[in-house]
């Protein structure tokens, strides 16, 4: 009986020491838990074709990259992400590529800065973006 009590106590202490929080993918440093936003072109909302797969790939200054899926109206919602500055690339995959390109990429000229406490972001795609 003592062995069972020791095992239970050891397990509980392990949870207390190591925690059972969210997996941060091995990232060490400050993060935000959730945020949302949208992409714009010349200050106007962007619409993507229904069924088109659109992702904003962001590159943290630490070298880590993350994919942010966008909805047809250019909106996004994300769980955790490291605080800091990001370079960005917009990737679009058409619903039915046919004979055209299977994926197009656009380098977003501005950078994204994730800040502690900020929950809403607007990302301007820049004057050279072609809807």
Where do the PLM segments sit?
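Beta-strand-rich domain onsets/edges
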Residues: 17-35, 99-104, 129
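A short, solvent-exposed beta-strand micro-motif common in secreted/extracellular proteins
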Residues: 84-98
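Structured interaction patches on ligand/partner-binding surfaces of diverse proteins
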Residues: 94-120
